[in-house]
């Protein structure tokens, strides 16, 4: 069975545990196939993989042409499944996606994917970034902990994810008030924000601790003053010019401001409640560094 795969996909044995080509590989454990990662292959069906259905834990396909996924239901030992920028001759499988009882991580990336109807009690991590999916309404994954849905048309959370802790979104025009459907959200990563966008809606997440807005168009802290539970804010490579509003964020403990146009930190007052502050060293005077030390603020700096 394995010899057929070696011949068809031009795989060479490079060690006791790996068969590899220039773009793809198969991993073995105790002479059993446990992982398949194929790139830019033409895969007529999953029939070639069926002899290993009882041992396969991970299948990742990248830029592959896929014709028939009907046998996916037989891979009941899978923990990780990924279709990254693949081409599908038939996308009907996404209208009633196979329930794989041990699957923990599902990655579906590609503009051809327009819809997803799935029920799973096992999946904990889902990525549907860079798809054409517009709604989450038919995604029923009650134990989901991490969701990535950047660069797609989704503008709101319209399904309940009671255990979700980590979320990646394209924030421009996203309805942040819809985060009420993620009551246990802890970490939010937001990309492609619009200028002067308010994050008031995210205040519905009363357990939100971490917010990353790397390289976004914010000039001060007023958009975040209602995030009372926030403890860590990462605004690196953004457009922060002043600390206005920061003094209102009483529970904030860690702030990262590397790569922002703000010139100098002239007062201890806006940052005195922080435990850790990251910024270029030349923007903090020796006097301010002494004040930070007096307030037990850990100064994380770079020399640039």
What are these regions (language model features)?
Residues 36-43, 60-66, 77-90, 102-114, ...:
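Concave beta-strand-loop units of leucine-rich repeat
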Residues 1-20, 117, 137, 158, ...:
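Positively charged, hydrophobic/aromatic-enriched amphipathic segments
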Residues 49-51, 72-74, 94-97, 116-120, ...:
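Hydrophobic anchor residues at the C-terminal helix/turn of individual leucine-rich repeat
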Residues 1-8, 13, 50-52, 95, ...:
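Plant-biased, solvent-exposed loop and capping regions
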Residues 26, 199-200:
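Periodic aromatic/glycine/histidine/acidic cluster detector
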Residues 5-85:
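LRR N-terminal entry segment and analogous cap-like coil->beta motifs
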């Amino acid at each position: 069975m394995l010899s057929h795969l070696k011949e068809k996909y031009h795989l060479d044995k490079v060690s006791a545990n790996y068969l590899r080509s220039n773009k793809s590989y198969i991993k073995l454990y105790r002479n059993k196939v446990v992982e398949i990662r194929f790139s830019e292959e033409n895969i007529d069906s999953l029939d070639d993989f069926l002899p290993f259905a009882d041992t396969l834990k991970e299948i990742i396909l990248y830029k592959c042409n896929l014709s028939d996924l009907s046998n996916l239901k037989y891979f009941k030992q899978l923990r990780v499944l990924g279709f990254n920028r693949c081409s599908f001759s038939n996308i009907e499988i996404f209208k009633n996606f196979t329930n794989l009882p041990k699957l923990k991580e599902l990655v579906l990336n590609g503009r051809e994917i327009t819809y997803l109807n799935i029920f799973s009690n096992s999946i904990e991590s889902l990525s549907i970034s860079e798809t054409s999916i517009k709604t989450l309404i038919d995604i029923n994954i009650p134990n989901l902990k991490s969701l990535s849905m950047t660069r797609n048309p989704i503008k709101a959370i319209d399904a309940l994810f009671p255990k979700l802790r980590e979320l990646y979104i394209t924030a421009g025009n996203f309805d942040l008030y819809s985060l009420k459907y993620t009551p246990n959200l802890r970490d939010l990563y937001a990309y492609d924000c619009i200028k002067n966008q308010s994050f008031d809606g995210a205040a519905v997440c009363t357990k939100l601790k971490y917010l990353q807005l790397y390289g976004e168009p914010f000039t001060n802290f007023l958009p975040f003053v209602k995030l009372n539970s926030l403890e860590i804010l990462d605004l690196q490579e953004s457009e922060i010019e002043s600390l206005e509003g920061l003094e209102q964020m009483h529970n904030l403990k860690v702030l990262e401001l590397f790569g922002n146009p703000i010139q100098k930190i002239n007062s201890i007052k806006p940052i005195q409640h922080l435990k850790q502050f990251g910024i270029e060293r030349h923007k903090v005077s020796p006097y301010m560094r002494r004040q930070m030390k007096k307030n037990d603020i850990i100064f994380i700096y770079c020399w640039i």
